[in-house]
Amino acid sequence: MKISPLPVSDDKHLWVGWDEYHRSIERLVRVVYESGWKFDQVLCLARGGLRPGDVFSRIFDLPLAILSTSSYRAEAGTVQGALNIAKHVTVTKGTLEGKVLLVDDLADSGVTLSKVQRHLQANFPSVTEVRSAVIWCKACSTFKPDYFLEYLPTNPWIHQPFEEYDSMRPEQVVARLKDAD
């Protein structure tokens, strides 16, 4: 399978490939680690925070909890709609409690992180502290995460490597693999 080079990033578009994406997650791990803050669980927001949350959980050797949220739906995930927050958090054992690191891919408008923080305060009294970590923080975000890797003053659209799957269907995957085999 031939991999096409990424377009050049500019003030309006930030193009991120798989290698850069994974390196960015590792650099965010370093930012959180070097802060010295000790937390008990990682809570990632599905879907954008799933990959970073998984990496954080593995590296810090802490339980991973998942909270599903959704707001980007229309036009292959590029238009923000109403925010939906799942009622329940998925955890492998016990409950969500103690100091929680909330992980997502980015702070765009800030609405998701802000509402999730309030959701946790209202519904999870055993959570004693929540801090947030994202790879990218846009200047337009009304919510400033505790930890972020990159501040984006021009608010570009971030083209993440997995976005190609937003508009891909099974028959397209089959055709692509057939061409590659």
Set out the residue ranges of the language-model regions.
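PRPP-associated nucleotide enzymes
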Residues: 1-181
